[in-house]
């Protein structure tokens, strides 16, 4: 006799990974519940991560654009805005996103349960509701999509009113004139751009020898130069010895002997999976030191009926990839296997000011692999559209095979880079000889557009061949 479960599947977390899994499951006829500990759906992506930080970035970049526009060069009309004002714009976007995502669940008859869940046994969850009651829920299968949170070292006092992480920085209500950002990864670099754009002094502490080392070196160097040119002070190969919170700010002691003082500190060095509250020990599931779970190609954990997607499984830790992972896991969960899979070359978008985006191999990787590649470049300052809108800072670089003309990598630095990259990505994904740099020479682009950079870069690269 078949077992009677409350649900076919329970999804823990309503971020991009959880949403992708839940929507994929209900579309296949499964009875699904989604558990969310926060009072709104959307997860960290919507409330503390991607959406608010990008909304902040957009507001700041528009202020910079206004102040640098020669039409408004009368200094009596310089535009200024407080961090609190800009946060209001982010709140508006968050509310729109939340309402939209809540609608997805309601239209698809997917039940949302609020509270903190933990495993009792392999098929049972205890749900601690916000009113203090505890419910017991059973399901045949589970998807863990509980996301991640900023890493908190034990010797840093995050309760201090001037010490923030990348979540709590969104509740910053004073106006700092000087900020220390510890950690020069994607989050640290994005917030360095935002604060510097608001005319705040920034000390960016990098524990490594260059910024964003996973990027093509030219892109990394471009960002370093742009930061230097805008007044961001970058300190490479540094680690903190001690962090002191004061009444009027923060003092950071570095292991190199240096001391820095600023109005506040943003600690942005690493993230950890939100698995510690799930009581995974009750079901024999183990996480690594960062609270992350190991999964196979179908996103199954060591227990085949429990799947995991999103930040909780580590790389690539992107909202876009998490949604796809959830969708693939849903297919595997219902059908026993997944025909869909993540694409090999996942695009990266970094929302600094200006943006950076890339897909495929870097020059350093191709050189190490001894692939005979050539480079085609287009400078934004030579494009009519860039000149019209004043977006002269930036470049598009296409790496392609000298003999087959196959596109191997695309790297873009400049405004709208994260949008521009997808034109090249679409051609890179073509099979049967469709992936060729000659496509950009043989097609007709609207004029004037930023997309035209592909034609300029393709001609530049092909002209290097002999």
Swiss-Prot record:
Its EC number is 1.6.1.1. The gene is sthA. PANTHER family: DISULFIDE OXIDOREDUCTASE, SOLUBLE PYRIDINE NUCLEOTIDE TRANSHYDROGENASE. This is Soluble pyridine nucleotide transhydrogenase. It comes from the Bacteria. Pfam families: Pyr_redox_2, Pyr_redox_dim. Keywords: Cytoplasm, FAD, Flavoprotein, NAD, NADP, Oxidoreductase. Conversion of NADPH, generated by peripheral catabolic pathways, to NADH, which can enter the respiratory chain for energy generation. It comes from Citrobacter koseri (strain ATCC BAA-895 / CDC 4225-83 / SGSC4696). Belongs to the class-I pyridine nucleotide-disulfide oxidoreductase family. Its cofactor is FAD.
């Amino acid at each position: 006799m078949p077992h009677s479960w409350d649900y076919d599947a329970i999804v823990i977390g309503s971020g991009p990974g959880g949403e992708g899994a839940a929507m994929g499951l209900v579309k296949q006829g499964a009875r699904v519940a989604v558990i969310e500990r926060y009072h709104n759906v959307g997860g960290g992506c919507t409330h503390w991560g991607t959406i608010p930080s990008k909304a902040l970035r957009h507001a700041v970049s528009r202020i910079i654009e206004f102040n640098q526009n020669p039409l408004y060069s009368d200094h009596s009309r310089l535009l200024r805005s407080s961090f609190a004002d800009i946060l209001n714009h982010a709140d508006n976007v968050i509310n729109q996103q939340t309402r939209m995502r809540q609608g997805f669940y309601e239209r698809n008859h997917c039940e949302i349960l609020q509270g903190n869940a933990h495993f009792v046994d392999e098929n049972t969850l205890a749900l601690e509701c916000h009113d203090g009651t505890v419910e017991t829920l059973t399901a045949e299968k589970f998807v863990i999509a509980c996301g991640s949170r900023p890493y908190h070292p034990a010797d840093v006092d995050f309760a201090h009113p001037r010490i923030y992480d990348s979540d709590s920085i969104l509740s910053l209500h004073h106006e700092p004139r000087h900020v220390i950002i510890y950690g020069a990864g994607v989050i640290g670099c994005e917030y360095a751009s935002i604060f510097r754009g608001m005319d705040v002094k920034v000390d960016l502490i990098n524990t490594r020898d260059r910024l964003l080392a996973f990027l093509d070196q030219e892109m990394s160097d471009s960002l370093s130069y742009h930061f230097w040119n805008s007044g961001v002070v970058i300190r490479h190969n540094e680690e903190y010895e001690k962090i002191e919170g004061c009444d009027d700010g923060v003092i950071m002691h570095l292991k190199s002997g240096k001391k820095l003082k600023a109005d506040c500190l943003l600690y942005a060095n690493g993230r950890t999976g939100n698995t510690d509250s799930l009581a995974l020990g009750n079901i024999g599931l183990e996480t690594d030191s960062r609270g992350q779970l190991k999964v196979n190609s179908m996103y199954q954990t060591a227990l085949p009926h429990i799947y995991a997607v999103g930040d909780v499984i580590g790389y690539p830790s992107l909202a876009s990839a998490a949604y796809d992972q959830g969708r693939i896991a849903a297919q595997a969960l219902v059908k026993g296997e997944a025909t869909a899979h993540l694409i090999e070359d996942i695009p990266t978008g970094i929302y600094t000011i200006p943006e950076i985006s890339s897909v495929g191999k870097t020059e350093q990787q191709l050189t190490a692999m001894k692939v005979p590649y050539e480079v085609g470049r287009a400078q934004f300052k030579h494009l009519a559209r860039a000149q019209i809108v004043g977006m002269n800072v930036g470049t598009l670089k296409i790496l392609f095979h000298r003999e087959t003309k196959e596109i191997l990598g695309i790297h873009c630095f400049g405004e709208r880079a994260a949008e521009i990259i997808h034109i090249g990505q679409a051609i890179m994904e073509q099979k049967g000889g469709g992936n060729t740099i000659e496509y950009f020479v043989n097609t007709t682009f609207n004029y004037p557009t930023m997309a035209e950079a592909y034609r300029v870069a393709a001609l530049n690269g092909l002209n290097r061949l002999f």
